[in-house]
Amino acid sequence: TSLTIEGIRLVVDAGLSRESRFDPASGLSRLETVRVSLAGARQRAGRAGRLEPGICCRLWQQAEEHGFRPRQRPEILDADLAPFCLHLAVWGARRPENLPWLDLPPRAHLAVAREQLAGLGAIAPGTEELLPTPLGRQLVKLPLPPRLACLLLRAREHGYGALAACVA
């Protein structure tokens, strides 16, 4: 995310960015520091002097750019798909792998999402289709990842809603 700030005439670009990566083995996402893409570097350079003349100082040699990716990897390839799969289930899209994707998400990520949602009780277990349960329909109404939404709802049932909100 970038924003334009008046008076900024110099951008120092280290050539790095933080990108979220989902690890299907742990079921968690983490931020990784990676080289910026060529498109990202061009966009950053445009931040200098957006409103007046400016300079972009890059902290890498131009020859290093041959190793840069042309553009950032599509986010869906590295995302936790559980929230998305829960929305698909509620919308009636039962088999995400059959949708006309621009970039097909990894099967492992879809499998982990199904497993996580079934474990929470958000979708019916033991089926390849995404069949939402009443709990799943409640979870999708909260603007949170399914695990946190489930934590809040279950804690509220036991009188610990405020504590769970602090933990979440």
Regions found by a protein language model. Name each.
Residues 5-10, 14-68, 82-87, 167:
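Conserved segment of the helicase C-terminal RecA-like domain
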Residues 58-168:
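C-terminal accessory/connector segments of nucleic-acid motor ATPases
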